[in-house]
Amino acid sequence: MNHTKMHTAVTNPIALGVIGLQKGDVYASDFQVTAIPEYKTEIRVQITKENFNRTTFDTYLKAAKGNEHKINYVDSLEAKPQFVILELLDRVALMAEIEEAHNTKTLRYIKSQKETGIVTSVSLAISQELIQELDNADVVFLKNSAYKQYQLSLVKEGETYKTIDFAKTSIFGYTLSYFCWRENDKRQITLADIIDEKSSCSKNTYRDAEKALENMNYFKL
């Protein structure tokens, strides 16, 4: 992933896994959350640690008013503080959850809005203690903690030993992915893929669900 192409999260709260619309064409524009899927099945998350540089640190300061995590960044020092990138890793499980009955309204909405995106990675600042907890985990999942709220579930040796609420983090960047649609064997329009922002849908799949429907109807003639 090219993390320099992340959108910056300044004015609106962003969370991993939410759905919405990007306002404007520039990477500093706003993201409007329009749907919050329910993830009854946990979605695996990839964890990557990165060193702050001047650009990412300044972006963090804009998002975290008052440097709430007390991160000390000095250009001249070789040792730099770290932030974390979380990325939804299991796209198959993600699509399956969105198509479950408990997300019927969300699925109907994204079918009707071809510009709808889903936040599939975030850059966030957390305490050094929580970074160490993430390091200790065998695997990390995104899960629902309460109605329309998410948290991270940290698993070691098959057992959840800690959860982290996003309220304890400062998200300062995010990337979006988009939905591709196709006709299935039952001649229904279904999710085919979730692709990165600058990618294109594969052959016979479409960003616009209506176009997939038109294509299906054409071949019925």
Each PLM stretch: what is its role?
Residues 141-148:
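A short, structured loop/turn motif at beta-sheet edges
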Residues 32-37, 70-139, 153-219:
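Membrane pore-forming effector domains from diverse proteins
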Residues 1-80, 198-221:
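An N-terminally focused, membrane-permeabilizing/fusogenic/translocator signature enriched
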